[in-house]
Swiss-Prot record:
Places the protein is found: Cytoplasm
Lineage: Bacteria, Pseudomonadati, Pseudomonadota, Gammaproteobacteria, Legionellales
Function, as annotated: Required for maturation of 30S ribosomal subunits.
SUPFAM superfamilies in the record: YhbC-like, C-terminal domain, YhbC-like, N-terminal domain
Protein name: Ribosome maturation factor RimP
Alphabetized UniProt keyword annotations: Cytoplasm, Ribosome biogenesis
Length: 153
């Protein structure tokens, strides 16, 4: 299990106890700094004060459990307009929206695709309508995915 998934399982109860959805978390390095980025949401969106409240709660859990070696920066925010997609339920929730995905391994010489989310089946296979074809991808083959903000309406 990846460290991000371990962290997700560790902090999810604290986030949910406050009445928020833990959309996902990512652990990465930016220069010499380790960053734990946590995305939280609720119906109607989440504000700055609520993010601060969640940050304090997560910090308390992480201080006790100490799952990250060394120093790190905790960033808690809303997922934003181009929110990340992690689970089959995220894809289902945004059927009809445009997304960009990056695959773990290339398909037909390509790793990145953009298209409309049209379906997610019970086997957790995501179907995207690309410009000129349909792409079906098992969720486990997707390395990273985000919605594409549509400002044209």
């Amino acid at each position: 299990m990846s460290q991000a998934r371990t962290l997700h399982r560790l902090i999810a109860p604290a986030v949910e106890a406050l009445g928020f959805e833990l959309v996902g978390c990512e652990l990465f390095r930016r220069g010499a700094t380790t960053i734990l980025q946590v995305f939280v949401d609720k119906p109607g969106g989440i504000g700055l004060d609520e993010c601060a409240k969640v940050s304090r709660q997560i910090s308390a859990v992480l201080d006790v459990e100490d799952p990250i070696r060394g120093r790190y920066t905790l960033e808690v925010s809303s997922p934003g307009l181009e929110r990340p997609l992690y689970t089959a339920n995220h894809y289902r929730r945004f059927i009809g929206n445009k997304a960009k995905i990056r695959l773990r391994e290339p398909r037909e010489g390509q790793r990145q695709f953009r298209g409309m989310i049209v379906a997610v089946d019970n086997e957790e296979q995501v179907t995207l309508q690309l410009d000129n074809k349909i792409l079906k991808v098992p969720l486990g083959e997707i390395e990273k995915a985000n919605l594409i903000a549509d400002f044209e309406g």
